[in-house]
Amino acid sequence: DRSYGRGGQLREDKKWRYYYDSHGNLVLKTMRRSGPSLETGMRDEFLAWQSGDYAYTWQGNGMLRSVTRPDGKTVTFRYDALGRRIEKVFDGRVYRYLWDGDVILHEWDYAEADRPNTIVTETGEVTLDRPEPVENLITWVYDSDSYVPTAKIVGDKHYSIISDYIGRPV
């Protein structure tokens, strides 16, 4: 019910076909059952997003830049210098992530229209033209010296997270 290509890449399952770029990144997930061979010269046209497809774009460093969904809406991602996702933009909302080392400390979102602009002051300082909004703030609490979450704080509500012996929430 599945077929795989070189390097174990999933090529086809019962519902989808998968296409990859020369770096091994998934670029298209489609239900279309016919496509050109590599020799036809039409591969790039075929790999362009069409309704019903998932299309993926990648940064030069292998980080996911965007996903275009079957409904045509696009989700975009930004990362910090350490490769941690710091932003997701989708459907008019900006979702932000603040990290403490290797774990997410805070996440929040706000309307994309409220996003502050980056400006350069007369002294050459790069800053924002207004404070970034913080709505729907979520704070994560972790077991000391581990990556296992123990609590989630949303507004004035506190939730405990119970995990098994290997750190999976139960």
Describe the residue ranges of each PLM region.
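Short, ordered secondary-structure scaffold segments
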Residues: 2-51, 57, 94-170
